[in-house]
A protein has these predicted regions:
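Membrane-embedded beta-strands of outer-membrane beta-barrel proteins
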Residues: 62-64, 98-100, 179-183, 238-242, ...
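Short glycine/proline- and aromatic-enriched beta-strand/turn motifs that initiate or cap beta-hairpins
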Residues: 21-79, 83-88, 156-162, 286-293
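Sec-dependent N-terminal signal peptides
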Residues: 5-17
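Sec-dependent signal peptide cleavage junction
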Residues: 18-43, 109-137, 292-293
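Solvent-exposed loop/turn segments connecting transmembrane beta-strands
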Residues: 50-61, 82-93, 230-236, 266-284
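Gram-negative (and chloroplast) outer-membrane scaffold detector with strong preference
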Residues: 74, 79-213
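Outer-membrane beta-barrel "beta-signal"
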Residues: 96-111, 277-293
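Outer-membrane beta-barrel transmembrane domain signature
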Residues: 24-35, 40, 146, 154-276, ...
């Protein structure tokens, strides 16, 4: 009796493993033109810090991040951030970048696209450990590639604590105001897929890497113990970055299913160099609450 029961249990386990192993996914439709290239995101957490001027670092900034298509080739974009928590303040700390990008060329290719099926995050406060688990597959899809030229305005205000040898000048305001110009490469995908159990779902993403030259003529009048000391000047900088837009489609293109908060995320990462800030990192997350075509 016990032997038969054990054999039945083993059989059920093997059957469940076999069923799970046989679960497959297939692409039923793919068209990157269905994806929404434009977005308006509420930026709820961004860090913006220059490593040569940590006094001017923003530990927590909020704002908006947007891209709006004027036509098939021309798009305008803007990033506006206000610092809620800075290491030092000398006036309001903010970053504002606004410009446009123009499509130079585009092509569509068949690619294997990674699709995230599930993600889970757990924190064990007792043992102070974190566990992340996810499941993903690669599915065939059409990917649109677009080369763009870009340019615009770049303005940032923060604090500056300038040091020279063993001389530490008074904390003052540092304002970057100038322009950027560069190139970008937009990759867009949208697909519909079906699992072997019949479940249907949509997936897609927009990835926007770019590289810019920053022309920021910056002049700072330094003071030492409240008295005028010297004037310093720098002009050139650069940045390279990427914006990743998850789920660039609406409920209508998602089998009439609501898209969750984190699935509607916009991730941004910039690295580069700014006058007197040196090497800098700007990175954060936004909630994509409006999508545009």
């Amino acid at each position: 009796m016990m032997k038969n029961l054990l054999l039945v249990c083993i059989g059920l386990v093997l059957l469940s493993v076999s069923v799970h192993a046989q679960e497959t996914y297939r692409t039923t439709m793919s068209d990157p033109e269905i994806a929404y290239p434009g977005y308006l995101g509420l930026n709820y957490f961004t860090v913006d810090a220059g490593f040569s001027n940590t006094s001017g670092a923003s530990i927590w900034s909020v704002g908006v991040d947007g891209l709006y298509p004027i036509n098939e080739k021309l798009r305008v974009e803007a990033l506006a951030l206000y610092s809620l928590l800075s290491l030092q303040k000398d006036g309001p700390a903010f970053l504002f970048s606004a410009g446009a990008e123009y499509g130079i060329s585009s092509k569509t290719k068949d690619k294997e696209v990674p699709v995230l099926l599930s993600f889970a995050w757990e924190k064990d406060y007792f043992n102070n450990t974190e566990t992340q688990t996810w499941e993903a597959v690669k599915l065939p899809a059409k990917m649109k590639y677009e080369l763009v030229a870009r340019g615009g305005l770049y303005v940032r205000n923060s604090a500056l604590e300038y040091e020279e040898g063993f001389t530490y000048y008074d904390v003052t305001s540092l304002t970057h105001a100038g322009v950027y110009a560069g190139v970008g490469y937009t990759m867009t995908s949208y697909l519909q897929a079906q699992a072997s159990d019949g479940y249907e779902f949509a997936a897609g993403r927009v990835i926007r890497p770019y590289a810019d030259v920053l022309i920021l003529p910056t002049t700072v009048d330094l003071e030492l113990n409240g008295a005028a000391a010297k004037t310093i000047e720098e002009t050139l900088g650069w940045r390279a970055g990427v914006v990743v837009v998850g789920k660039p489609f609406t409920k209508a293109e998602n089998y009439d299913r609501k898209i969750g908060f984190f699935a509607n995320s916009i991730f941004r990462l910039d690295i580069g160099s700014r006058p007197f800030d040196g090497f800098f990192v700007t990175t954060g997350m936004a909630w994509n609450f409006k999508k545009f075509k």
